[in-house]
Amino acid sequence: MPRREWRGPILNGVLTNPNESVIMRFLSPQDAVAIEDQHTHHTVTQSETVWSGRIVDMVKDHVVVVEGQDPVVREYTRHPGAVAVVVMRGESGAEEILMERQYRHPVQASLWEIPAGLLDIPGEDPRVAAQRELAEEADMVADRWDVLVDYFTSPGGSTEPLRIFLARDLRAADEVFDREDEEATMEYAWVRLDDALTMVLDGRLHNPSAVIGVLATHAARGRGWADLRPADAPWLRS
């Protein structure tokens, strides 16, 4: 993309160059407060699965992103999605969240994370999947579930959506699970929410669900938990 060396004024929501050619269009302040992600349709003229794995597929699409122009090629992984859980206990102002340390081979690092797992059972309710992961990874059950935040893990290269739940009112699970592979060596810690926030801002935590979950939980607490959504709230997924 060619670099533009000029800086034009913003007039009536439009950034213009000295020749008054429209370059960028801005929403009005009134419209900006209502922005929301949404599905949009673009014509795919050709699609092929380049490679299939146990969890993800590599897909190559030829897609028309600008009407009237030739299709462009986009390669991405097709992923079933995942859920994660911020597990919280403690009195107001002294909340603690559960963190677990797990080896992640692709990045060759042991990361402090929150419980999480794949949506690899077709049609399964995301909350049910999150409840299963909490029981399997931490031997706990939660009686209160809310949606904390939703995001796409890497929307430029993957279809993977991820929903983070906030789980409270905890109790021990009836069954203790045998953990295998990387999960067999996990370590656990109850971390004060304020300390977890410091860890994120200090660059000590790198797992995206943990980072986003900590930031969202801290923000939600600061707003009195008023913005939490019900566990079955709508979810933008591909």
Feature annotation, model-predicted:
Residues 13-33, 37-38, 42, 110, ...:
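Nudix hydrolase/Nudix homology domain
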Residues 25-27, 41, 74-79, 86, ...:
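Conserved Nudix-box catalytic region and its N-terminal flanking loop in Nudix hydrolases
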Residues 46-86:
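Acidic, metal-coordinating catalytic segment for phosphate/diphosphate chemistry
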Residues 57-62, 110, 161-163, 187:
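Short beta-strand micro-motifs in enzyme catalytic cores
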Residues 60-62, 87-89, 166-168, 190-192:
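Short, well-ordered beta-strand micro-motif
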Residues 141-148:
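A short coil-to-beta-strand element that immediately follows conserved catalytic motifs
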